[in-house]
Amino acid sequence: MGHTVVLPNSFDKPLQEERMKKLGSDEHRKWKAKMLRAQGKKVAVSDAVLVLNFEKHGQLNYIGGATFLEIFKAFELGKKIFLYNPIPENFLKDELLGMGPIVINGDLRLVV
């Protein structure tokens, strides 16, 4: 496919956020701000964003707050936005539709 992948924050430390929460709200807030700034920079240097929106917490095609912000940053910067699965049926649906993501329904060949 010829794509270079930029991994999301904490990819190699999936439980880091839970550890930061245990350190207290101030430490967690500082860590979260640092992660959000870092992710914005990653989106800025990328051609597109591919969101792997799988089931989580019992919700199909889950997109959390931080991921929504990444999608918005990509939209703001004019980047392509790909969703692995359809847009979730939740309170962010209209906003997500407005950003015009390309739903690939699991077909990675559509990421071009």
Regions found by a protein language model. Give the residues of each.
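Conserved catalytic or regulatory cores that recognize and/or transform ribose-phosphate-containing ligands
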Residues: 1-112
